[in-house]
Amino acid sequence: MKTLIKNAVLLDMVGDKPNAHKTDILLEDNKISKIEEKIEEDDCDIIDAKEMVVMPGFINTHTHLAMSIFRGYKDDQKLMDWLENAIFPVEDQLRPDDIYWNSFLSCIELIKTGTTTFNDMYFRMDKTIEAVEQSGLRGVIAWSI
């Protein structure tokens, strides 16, 4: 299957500063096969990306995917008070499936915001790895210390 993205503004990071230029991008089997100013290709789906920007995926170097469910929870406290009195007691109640679904939710959020690679640390990493594999993202994953 081929997809041709036409008329995109490509933001590349070649050199000392970002460079933007109009380009076409050909995808074959969901992988970039050609990037040129003008591509003519038959028998493919065409996406008109006029006034849209194509750029490298973002990289998030510090995540705790399974903690997405705690976002905003009792966040008016100092860090150690928040961890010891709010987060740790709730984390003790998390089941393996909770870790999986919280991590999967975070993967969806990363994808929707253009993040393609991340670094994650937590516990029950087997469940986080399972969610990441399902999502197709790239991750560097380690146990929290």
What annotation goes with each model-predicted range?
Residues V14, N19, M67-R71, M121, ...:
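Active-site-proximal flexible loops/turns
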Residues I69-Y100, I108, V140-I145:
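Active-site gating loops and adjacent loop-to-helix segments of metal-dependent hydrolytic enzymes
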